Amino acid sequence: CCSALCSRYHCLPCC
């Protein structure tokens, strides 16, 4: 995951 905010919900390439 690129950012902690994104990783809370889903592992996205980069938000």
Curated annotation (Swiss-Prot):
What does the sequence similarity comment in the record state about its family?
Answer: Belongs to the conotoxin M superfamily.
Disulphide bonds in the chain: 1-15, 2-11, 6-14
General function of this protein: Slowly and reversibly inhibits human nicotinic acetylcholine receptors (nAChR) alpha-7/CHRNA7 (IC(50)=45.7 uM). It is unknown whether it inhibits nAChRs by a competitive or a non-competitive mechanism.
Species this protein is from: Conus archon
Annotated tissue distribution: Expressed by the venom duct.
Q: Does the keyword Secreted apply?
A: yes
Record flagged with keyword Transmembrane: no
Where in the cell does this protein reside? Secreted
Give one GO molecular function term.
toxin activity
Which cellular components does GO assign to this protein?
Answer: extracellular region; host cell postsynaptic membrane
- Other information: Has low or no effect on human alpha-3-beta-2/CHRNA3-CHRNB2 and alpha-7-beta-2/CHRNA7-CHRNB2 nAChR.
Entry keyword set:
Acetylcholine receptor inhibiting toxin, Amidation, Disulfide bond, Neurotoxin, Postsynaptic neurotoxin, Secreted, Toxin
- How is the polypeptide modified once translated? Has a free C-terminus.
Could you give the domain comment from the record?
A: The cysteine framework is III (CC-C-C-CC).
Q: What is this protein called?
A: Conotoxin ArchIIIA
